[in-house]
Amino acid sequence: FPAKGSLPTKIPAPNFSPDDFVVKLGISYAGEYSINFNSLPHMLIAGATGGGKIILSRWIIYQIVNKGAFTYLVDQKGYVDYRDLREDCRCLDTNEEILDGLKSVVDEIARRMELCRSAWISKISDYNVLPGVEPQPPIFVVIDEANCLLDTTGKSKVEKDFIAQVVQHLLTITRLGRAAHVHLICICQRSDVNSIPGALKANMEIRITSHCADKESSMTILGNGDAANLPKIPGRFLASDGTEFQAYDFTCPPGQNL
């Protein structure tokens, strides 16, 4: 394992974890750093431009789709960073598509919970191993530039009504999604009260950020000021569990979509 102060700054992406719920993120001082969406179902990734959050988010999407997850993707920048990854995601572009897509996810959570109730079990992962049933794949909703989608500052009443509906669907997903194997990943440049509602952020157990300009910015994401002391190294992140890690440097294989 790397000694303190000697994390590499460029680490090629490895093979996937064999475990369905486990996604590899990078290398920490204790070794490989992974997260398990079974126990920590929802994630917030924050960081300024150039911090490496797009490379990390692309690597996460690449893993979950290759593990068989049905992935909804929302990108307010027009998928510039996801051109090679979007073919196997359902991309939600217009406001109508976003609301319809999120509602379908909420409806799917309800359907899966009814399957569980009918089988006298509490979560869809237990349902999937029952004999004779059709396994229900994991579902991920990935929102890049979440602050652009959710910030109500300067918005019209119509726009605020749209945002309120989006937030309500996202809150439902984060409150009920775990047992249904439905997960939310939000990626943003900042995470203040205007860009990510506090109730939504509180439901996102995994929070990760690159270097923050000040302790106040770090506080809004992690609940402490530690990210202000993080080195300004592209791909260097601090997680809400206190782990500092260098994200894997991922490039989609040439000529290969997901």
Which positions does each model-derived feature cover?
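Conserved alpha-helical scaffold flanking the Walker A/P-loop in AAA+ ATPase domains
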Residues: 104, 125-133
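Short beta-strand segments
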Residues: 33-35, 131, 243-245
